[in-house]
Design a protein with these regions (language model features):
Chain C
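Hydrophobic transmembrane alpha-helices and immediately adjacent juxtamembrane helices
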Residues: 1-167, 171-280
């Protein structure tokens, strides 16, 4: 449904998106994972057919956004990073008016607005203004708004950034439901748990470039070990202990506050550390995550 | 818990949507304006009544008294200022509906970017905003004109030509203000500056309260570039039979048209650029 | 380092004032707010600042010189005839004091309350709500004072201030601004949206047009005159006009008292409201 080849966006001298290739297929949930400033929003705006690409090729729903912007946008649902809701209007009016922009009739929109309010679990807030709603509710309203034209593709730019954990889970639940209904979605995020939860397939993006592509499980398999042992020796001693740890694992990462030891069996590795006569202050064994993939690819963590 | 059941991509009739875009933006603006209906009605009626009473029995009394009851050019002072007040109200009422919304849309709530994500093109946003302002303009000149009639400040026969020429001045001025607003990155006292350096002098020095020729020559240029003066001049020809020349009337209307075209010409590309950022 | 000094100072002040009357709302640090506004002001748009000064000058040019020619002289309160320009200069001074004070204490404050959320942050420190009210109003006065001095510097050389008493018009305008700013800020603290803010302008316009600014109120029937006399702008115009034209009379003490009451009432409600809004 979306094909990008060598897609670039240059602001002045700065290459915000630097020659990326990817494809999004019908019915899948596609993710773009990357830290702040990676170029996710810029990519999204090009896919949304509002921002013109500087270079490369981009086809959305079989059309070129430079030539057929309105036609493409007619079948997209957009949930921008900042919600961009109209603060003067009530919840239902925000949905209704947005539907009108797509040329939809009052007859069509009347039941549709109620359906979307129900989907976003905002029936009670139907007549509230945007200010009177929590951040999570506003985001759900923005998602409902993005779905009002029954789009082929829904674009979500950092849908849960700035929300508290509970609001995030409510939102994830809604997005799962969308997936079950066969809506194609593109999601950007800098949360690795979100990417693991919501995406069938994803690309890891950093500094305008794509570093890797695959399924969450596949990426972890390719770029990390099965388990990770996190040990802390105290801030001043981590660095000194590192060389010794390197002998028991194929790879380690020294972070300012802890050391990550990449191994197949975490508990066994911990025993080996004890056998070396080292006594970490704390230790923790966990499964590898996309965070580790990112660290491996860029040498930095996702959230700074 | 509810589920969504739809076949993606079926609901929108693209060609229809692209055709009606501007009207849908106007619909949005009018709905938004309707939330302020009480203020719009109060200003629409209160403003002219207050000015007419104040000028009519206040300043007018002083002027008419000191000119021996002849006012200016043989008409009462109220009749002299009436066309200027009407044109000024049309310009102000209409332009308010582009300046604030444009700043709101680009800078405050950034709602234009949401509209820009739909079928609607930047050009259609411009047209829609303007269309809604035009509706406000019609309302303003109609109410103001009727109140002028009630105060016997204008003759009945000149009612329609007068409100029409005022509306034209409003259209030209509003297009210019739309272009100015589109260029504003952050407001930073924008309205205070425009209000005090542009609108206030224009209101005061456009031959509004006394003939332009009475002003020192070094201030008269304000009148010549001011749409308010052009409109007032047309209005006085229509209402109090002020003598004129055909070429001057042509200049007046050409000026409105030029502002209208120029305003749009400087607005369209800015909207297109800013929405694509 | 600086923060630790500031903190220890705040604590000292809080301790000093603890138990004193009004300690919950006032810590004697309103100056901090004025200082903050001054810093913000230095980086703000200078055109906006100048614009507050040019407005009355424009009106003077248009009405005083333009319409003045049509009108000739006006009889002032004591029966003397003065030129039209001399007649409206004090009114313009009073009006610009009002406009400036209202602008600073309504729109400005409204923005800070609802968008900048500046007060929440301030009231979380040792500042009390009266500090905020006084500081904000003090700032409005400082600006107003600058404008009135500037205006006087323009009109006095033109011979439009016939009396030396006119010098007192500057503190007079400051008193007027204080009154409007206190009440304006009190009203603003009750406003919830722009819509309501718009109504402030709606009530300012008739006040401007009818308060004896451009013509004597004697043109109106007696009962309307009494309504006008009750309006603060008419009180202000009468006060300043008495000073610049040198017509001193006892009624002026009444006008001054009017503003003292306005100030007290305005401060009382603003403090109460800010406390209820942010500190409960
Ligand atoms: N309109 C713009 N003009 C100039 N630079 C921009 C613009 N938009 C984004 N950038 C820059 O491009 C980079 C990528 O931004 P963005 O796509 O928003 O990143 P992300 O969404 O991944 O956090 C950032 O460094 C940002 O500063
Ligand atoms: Mg982003």
């Amino acid at each position: 449904m979306i094909v990008a080849k060598g897609l670039s966006k240059v602001y002045g001298e700065f290459r915000a998106v630097d020659g990326i290739d990817f494809e999004v297929h019908r019915g899948e949930s596609f993710g773009i994972l990357g830290p702040n400033g990676a170029g996710k929003s810029t990519t999204m705006k090009m896919i949304a057919a509002v921002s013109k690409r500087t270079d490369g090729e981009l086809t959305i729903l079989g059309k070129d956004p430079n030539l057929k912007g309105p036609e493409i946008r007619a079948h997209l649902g957009v949930v921008p990073q900042k919600d961009l809701l109209d603060r003067e209007l009530k919840a239902w009016e925000n949905l209704y008016i947005y539907g009108r922009y797509f040329g939809l009739s009052k007859k069509f929109l009347k039941p549709k607005v109620e359906e979307m309010l129900a989907f976003a679990q905002l029936e009670e807030k139907r007549n509230s203004k945007v200010e009177e709603m929590s951040g999570g509710m506003q985001r759900r309203l923005a998602i409902a708004r993005g779905l009002i034209n029954e789009p082929e593709i829904l674009l979500l730019d950092e849908p849960t950034t700035g929300l508290d954990p509970q609001a995030r889970h409510v939102l994830w639940d809604r997005l799962f439901r969308l997936k079950e209904n066969g809506v194609t979605t593109v999601i950007t995020t800098h949360y690795m748990d979100e990417a693991e939860q919501l995406c069938d397939r994803l690309v890891v993006m950093d500094k305008g470039k794509i570093m890797a592509e695959g399924t969450p499980a596949g990426l972890i398999k390719d770029y990390s070990s099965k388990e990770v042992l996190e040990v802390r020796f105290g801030t001043d001693r981590n660095e000194a202990t590192a060389p010794q740890l390197a002998t028991i694992a194929e790879r380690i990462e020294v972070l300012p506050d802890r050391i990550l030891v990449y191994v197949e069996d975490g508990d066994a590795a911990l025993e080996k550390i004890h056998a070396l006569g080292l006594r970490p202050v704390t230790s923790l064994v966990r499964r590898s995550s996309l965070e580790d993939v990112f660290l491996r690819l860029t040498g930095r963590s996702l959230v700074d | 818990m509810s589920d969504l059941k739809f076949v993606p991509g079926q609901a929108v009739n693209v060609r229809h949507a692209m055709r009606v875009g501007a009207f849908r933006v106007a619909e949005y603006r009018l709905r938004n304006m309707a939330k302020w209906w009480d203020a719009i009605i109060a200003f629409g009626i209160g403003n002219p009544v207050l000015y007419l009473v104040s000028v009519g029995i206040g300043i007018g009394a002083l002027v008419d008294h000191s000119t021996g009851g002849h006012g200016i050019g043989g008409v009462s002072y109220l009749q002299f200022v009436a066309p200027a007040l009407l044109a000024s109200a049309a310009m102000q009422g209409m332009s308010d509906e582009v300046t604030f919304p444009v700043l709101e849309g680009f800078t405050w709530s950034k709602y234009f970017f949401a509209i820009g994500g739909t079928v609607i093109s930047p050009k259609q946003i411009v047209n829609g905003i303007y269309l809604a302002a035009f509706v406000r303009g019609i309302w303003t000149v109609l109410t103001y004109g009727l109140i002028l009639l009630a105060f016997q400040a204008i003759p009945m026969v000149s009612f329609f030509p007068l409100i029409l020429s005022s509306l034209l001045a409003g259209c030209g001025w509003t297009a210019v203000m739309m272009a100015v607003s589109a260029h504003i990155k952050d407001d930073d006292g924008f309205f205070a500056i425009i209000g005090r350096f542009v609108i206030a002098p224009m209101f005061l020095f456009s031959g509004t309260f006394y003939p332009l020729s009475q002003m020192p020559i070094y201030l008269q240029w304000i009148g010549w570039i001011s749409p308010l003066w052009h409109s007032t001049d047309v209005g006085r020809v229509l209402t109090i039979g002020q003598p004129t020349q055909p070429w001057l009337m042509v200049v007046h209307f050409a000026y409105f048209v030029a502002m209208f075209i120029g305003g749009f010409a400087f607005t369209y590309p800015v909207f297109a650029r800013r929405l694509a950022e | 380092m600086i923060t630790s000094i500031a903190t220890s100072m705040a604590v000292r002040i809080a301790e000093k004032r603890a138990g004193k009357f009004g300690s919950g709302v006032y810590s004697g640090r309103a100056g901090q707010l004025v200082e903050r506004n001054f810093l913000a002001f230095k980086s703000s748009n200078w055109l906006v600042v100048i614009s507050g000064f040019v407005e009355p000058v424009f009106y003077l040019l248009a009405f005083g010189l333009g319409i003045g020619k049509l009108i000739g002289g006006v009889t002032d309160g004591s029966g003397h005839t003065v030129s039209y320009a001399q007649y409206i200069v004090p009114a313009l001074l009073a009006t610009s004091a009002m406009n400036g004070a209202i602008y600073d204490s309504t729109w400005n404050v409204f923005f800070k309350m609802h968008f900048g959320k500046i007060y929440q942050a301030m009231l979380a420190t040792s500042l009390g709500s009266l500090d905020v009210a006084l500081g904000e109003i003090g700032w409005a006065l400082l600006r107003g004072l600058t404008y009135s001095i500037g205006f006087m510097l323009v009109v006095a050389p033109m011979g439009l201030i016939p009396s030396w008493w006119g010098l007192l018009a500057i503190p007079g305008a400051t008193l007027i601004a204080f009154g409007f700013a206190s009440v304006g800020m009190g009203m603003t603290s009750f406003m919830k949206n722009f819509h309501q803010m718009d109504w402030i302008n709606f009530f300012m316009l008739p006040m401007f047009l009818f308060s004896g600014t451009f013509y004597p109120i004697s043109v109106f029937p007696e009962w309307i005159q009494w309504i006008i006399r009750a309006l603060p702008l008419n009180q202000a115009v009468e006060l300043i006009r008495g000073l610049t034209l040198g017509n001193l009379n006892l009624a002026m003490a009444g006008h001054a008292l009017y503003f003292v009451v306005m100030i007290a009432a305005g401060l009382f409600f603003t403090t109460k409201r800010l406390t209820a809004l942010f500190m409960s």
